[in-house]
Regions:
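Central cavity-lining transmembrane alpha-helices of secondary-active solute carriers
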Residues: 50-66
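Paired small-residue
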Residues: 89, 100-108
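Extracytoplasmic gate region of multi-pass secondary transporters
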Residues: 26-27, 214-239
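Juxtamembrane intracellular "pre-TM" segments in multi-pass secondary transporters
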Residues: 1-4, 187-217
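Conserved MFS/SLC helix-loop-helix module at the cytosolic interface between two early adjacent transmembrane helices
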Residues: 61-93
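Cytoplasmic helix-loop-helix junction between adjacent transmembrane helices
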Residues: 105-143
Length: 239
């Protein structure tokens, strides 16, 4: 039975689309901020860093909450809800008139962006034990593809159609991902129920109390910092 493979391919495709949506603005966000009234390059660089970084930050903070909801409601329903709200907030960015409005919407995108651990949990749930390394590798590759193709896609669309057009494109892409979940993903239920009396903060504290987990988190932070740190200011430097 290869039905589990179809679900994995779907989850990985959703991950690519979601990654493109969240990270794709990096290639043009400083220039868009100038269109919103920030003509000083120093201010534009600062706001670009804040606007670009707040979304991944909120994704990291909100992921435990959405993972818990996936245990309660089922991963299919939660992922559809996340993608629907993400579609609305990304599309709304095209109508922003001030940097603060853009920052608020980017923050909301991060709050509802915690679909990565849900996808990972689905893969672990449905994949045969001897195929888990392959499935995990494919999922990690899809995350990298989103990081690679997002800025490229955002920059190309912004160059051709203006700085507001990519938000419409990313919103439509998120909508397609949501429809893919609706039509192609079966209803699944995680086998292990989470103790509702345990808060997300206590769970985070527990995992961070493990030395190897702290080391892994630190290494991942430094790697991602090195890869994406220059992204918000690179368009200004090239300009």
């Amino acid at each position: 039975d290869s039905s589990w493979k179809r679900i994995i391919y779907l989850i990985c495709t959703i991950q690519v689309g979601g990654g493109i949506t969240i990270i794709g603005v990096i290639s043009f966000i400083p220039l868009f901020l100038a269109e919103l009234g920030l003509h000083d390059q120093g201010q534009a660089a600062m706001w670009a860093g804040i606007v670009s970084g707040v979304t991944p930050l909120m994704v990291a903070l909100s992921a435990p909450y959405w993972s818990r909801k996936a245990n309660q409601w089922g991963p299919r329903k939660v992922m559809m809800l996340i993608l629907f709200i993400l579609m609305i907030t990304v599309g709304a960015c095209a109508f922003t008139q001030t940097p603060m409005q853009l920052l608020i919407l980017r923050t909301l995108q991060g709050v509802v962006g915690g679909y990565v651990p849900i996808g990972l949990a689905i893969i672990v749930l449905i994949t045969p034990e001897n195929k888990v390394p392959w499935a995990m590798g494919l999922y990690q590759a899809s995350m990298v593809m989103g990081l690679v193709f997002g800025p490229l896609m955002g920059g190309l669309v912004a160059d051709l159609l203006g700085y507001r057009a990519p938000f419409f494109v990313f919103s439509a892409l998120t909508g397609i991902c949501m429809l893919g979940i609706y039509f192609l993903m079966p209803n699944l239920q995680f086998k292990h129920k989470v103790d509702e009396s345990v808060s997300e903060i206590s769970l985070i504290k527990y995992f961070l109390s493990i030395p190897r987990v702290r080391l892994l988190v630190g290494m991942l932070f430094l790697c991602n910092f090195g890869i994406t740190g220059i992204g918000p200011i690179l368009p200004l430097y090239i300009k």
